[in-house]
């Protein structure tokens, strides 16, 4: 009497419960099982492993600056979100990651889905050594201009860190009035995990804030356009006029 084969659903559960180090042994154990469902399952996990390997390699490439300056002490990534919108604040993030950070999928926040950004935000907030967030209001942007307001938000983010950094990795800019060594990196959120993490924190923070504004200031579509000049937003601006969070210095062409 032949031994009854395990069901494919049972094998699927075994694979799902296996750790990464246990998978190679499972491939060997089931490689002779000719059922299409089993072979497809093996191929699925092998593809996932290959994708994970590539992501780890990509992430390691994004640690070049972190490795270069690690002997100097704590390294902090700085980035901002919201320089271009017609409404809402500019938000800056400052993040110090652990030296042995294993966080994957960090990248320019605009390249990721909202769901993935939310997931990464939670991981960063849980695992980071320190996180600081700074804001510059629409009124402040109008008062001192967007560039100076961005610098102000960045300085606030740095000041809110619970650990003082020794090196700042900045996305492209050099922040005035900061007595910490700065390394400006063009397109830094795609080249440094620290800057990418700061970008993620700033982006998610600002997006959530604009979604809250949409509830109290309906009609402009803030939840979807996040204050940027979409057709819907501009039409509403012309029809109902500016809200308290519009940047007067940005909307002259529309009102």
Locations of the language-model features?
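RNase H-like, Mg2+-dependent phosphodiesterase core
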Residues: 1-76, 83-255
């Amino acid at each position: 009497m032949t031994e009854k084969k395990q069901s494919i659903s049972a094998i699927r559960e075994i694979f799902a419960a296996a750790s990464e180090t246990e998978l190679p042994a499972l491939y060997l154990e089931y490689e002779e099982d000719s059922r299409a469902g089993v072979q497809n399952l093996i191929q699925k996990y092998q593809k996932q492993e290959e994708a994970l390997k590539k992501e780890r390699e990509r992430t390691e490439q994004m640690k070049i600056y972190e490795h270069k300056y690690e002997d100097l002490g704590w390294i902090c990534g700085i980035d901002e979100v919201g320089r271009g919108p017609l409404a809402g604040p500019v938000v800056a993030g400052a993040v110090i990651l652990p030296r042995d950070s294993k966080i994957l999928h960090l990248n320019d926040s605009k390249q990721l889905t909202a769901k993935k950004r939310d997931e990464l935000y939670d991981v960063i907030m849980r695992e980071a050594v320190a996180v600081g967030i700074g804001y510059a209001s629409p009124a402040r942007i109008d008062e001192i201009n967007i560039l100076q307001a961005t610098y102000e938000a960045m300085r606030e983010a740095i000041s809110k860190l619970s650990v003082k950094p020794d090196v700042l990795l900045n996305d492209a800019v050099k922040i005035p009035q900061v007595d910490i060594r700065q390394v400006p990196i063009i397109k830094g959120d795609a080249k440094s995990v620290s800057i990418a993490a700061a970008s993620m924190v700033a982006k998610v923070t600002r997006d959530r804030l604009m979604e809250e504004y949409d509830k109290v200031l309906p009609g402009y579509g803030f939840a979807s356009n996040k204050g940027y000049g979409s057709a819907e937003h501009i039409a509403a601006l012309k029809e109902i006029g500016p809200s308290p969070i519009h940047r007067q210095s940005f909307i002259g062409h529309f009102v």
